[in-house]
Design a protein with these regions (language model features):
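Beta-propeller blade termini and top-face loops
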Residues: 1-218
């Protein structure tokens, strides 16, 4: 739990964590008022809150930005004109450089088709990390979310398929690296505790190294 707040009503309190919960009876029971179930209305991972105890007006900060409520948290409005997205990595489409992709902290893999500031949309959920676009075919896109879950699209990002089941038993980083051979975009390498290689654009993968995490630290 990140933090807890109690306002003038001694029976009403809020606890902030991944979910946001509220009690109306002094802590005897708690109701989740912001969680994965309503993440289309308010983001998860809650960190900060300001409360007007007389009006029920709330300002709430989380990994999705700033949200307000006028009824003690029953419903929410997103203040969505604040530029606060944090990118882990970006990728520029070689054939169509106005198309830019980015993996963002807790806010999906997103892209713009025009390069404009108001034209970004999600193509994959979770924490977005690395994205690669085939320089010979803009319809082929690779993107990942946390713990090495790698997806591929062959239709320009309209639909993504999971191609990471080969290493589902491997140890992976929160942000797992993968690269494309600049001479052959069908050849890619993916890093878990060992290195995986595909020469078929991700249809099949084989490990090409042993465990690389137990050697000399240098």
């Amino acid at each position: 739990t990140y933090e807890m707040y109690k306002i003038q009503n001694p029976n009403r309190a809020y606890a902030l964590g991944v979910d946001l919960v509220r009690t109306e009876n002094g802590g005897n029971s708690w109701e989740t008022i912001a969680g994965y179930w309503n993440s289309n209305e308010i983001h998860v991972d809650h960190h900060a809150r300001i409360i007007d105890p007389n009006t029920g007006y709330l300002l709430e900060g989380n990994d999705g930005g700033l949200f307000t409520s006028t009824n003690y948290g029953d419903t929410w409005t997103h203040i969505n004109n604040i530029p606060l997205t944090q990118f882990y990595a970006i990728e520029v489409d070689f054939q169509q450089p106005q198309q830019i992709y980015g993996g963002t902290q807790d806010n999906n893999t997103i892209r713009t088709l025009t390069g404009n500031l108001d034209d970004w949309h999600s193509i994959l959920g979770g924490d977005g990390f690395y994205t690669l676009v085939n320089p010979q075919n803009s319809d082929i896109i690779y993107a990942e979310y946390q713990w090495g879950i790698l997806y591929r699209s062959t239709n320009g990002g309209d639909w993504m398929e999971d191609i990471s089941y080969y290493w589902e038993e491997d140890r992976t980083n929160w942000s797992s690296p993968f690269v494309m051979d600049p001479a052959d975009p069908s050849t890619l390498y993916f890093g878990t505790y060992r290195v995986w290689k595909t020469t078929s654009g991700g249809n099949n993968w084989l490990p090409i190294s042993s465990d690389l995490t137990n050697g000399d630290d240098g």
